Amino acid sequence: MYTSNIQVASRYAKSLLKQAIDMGVLDHVYKDALFFKKVGKSHKTLFRVLHNPIIKNETKLAILTSIFQSRIHPLTFHLLKLLSHRKREGILPTIIDTFLEQYYIYRGIKAASVTTTFRLSDDLIRYFKNLAKSLVPCKEVILKEYVNPSIQGGFVLRIEDQQLDNSLATRLHKLKKQYSIAEY
């Protein structure tokens, strides 16, 4: 029977989350996951090495050990060793992403994004987080901000399957459409 990498990653992530909760180190493991994503983003060759079947598992483990062992919690490092032993280092990025999703669900955290024509001040970030909380019940909101001059002003807030489009570009488009329909 074929099991996809996503299903396997989900099992590892779920086990990591449960073990971290049981050991009382969930926040440490969460920080480790964020650190791993940061390293992976700045060193894209790391992912290519992990996915490369030609590179020996011992070499992959040595690389992971040199980068992470002194910087992450022993539970997280144990996962890296386990994956190397089982020759599954290539799914580590998927495990990390899945772990973060499960962590956010466990903590009641929702991800939202806001698009404006400028960088947001701290006050505006708080405002948009509160606005997102009013749209979807949650304990906390992680807000990603995007700058896009094409919206011409206003904002577009997205959380889960909801979008609050209060951009000038959309309002102008609606007005244009309304006046093109209304013939004199």
From Swiss-Prot:
An example GO CC term for this entry is: proton-transporting ATP synthase complex
Give any Pfam family that matches.
OSCP
How would you describe this protein's topology in the membrane? Peripheral membrane protein
Q: Name a GO molecular-function annotation.
A: proton-transporting ATP synthase activity, rotational mechanism
Cell membrane among keywords: yes
Q: Where in the cell is it found?
A: Cell membrane
The protein's UniProt keywords, in alphabetical order, are: ATP synthesis, Cell membrane, CF(1), Hydrogen ion transport, Ion transport, Membrane, Transport
Record has Transport as a keyword: yes
- The main location is membrane
Domain of life per record: Bacteria
Quaternary structure, per UniProt, is: F-type ATPases have 2 components, F(1) - the catalytic core - and F(0) - the membrane proton channel. F(1) has five subunits: alpha(3), beta(3), gamma(1), delta(1), epsilon(1). F(0) has three main subunits: a(1), b(2) and c(10-14). The alpha and beta chains form an alternating ring which encloses part of the gamma chain. F(1) is attached to F(0) by a central stalk formed by the gamma and epsilon chains, while a peripheral stalk is formed by the delta and b chains.
- NCBIfam families, per this entry? ATP_synt_delta
What's this protein's function?
F(1)F(0) ATP synthase produces ATP from ADP in the presence of a proton or sodium gradient. F-type ATPases consist of two structural domains, F(1) containing the extramembraneous catalytic core and F(0) containing the membrane proton channel, linked together by a central stalk and a peripheral stalk. During catalysis, ATP synthesis in the catalytic domain of F(1) is coupled via a rotary mechanism of the central stalk subunits to proton translocation.
Which family, according to UniProt?
Belongs to the ATPase delta chain family.
The entry's protein name is: ATP synthase subunit delta
The organism named in the record is Amoebophilus asiaticus (strain 5a2)
Which gene holds the coding sequence for this protein?
Answer: atpH
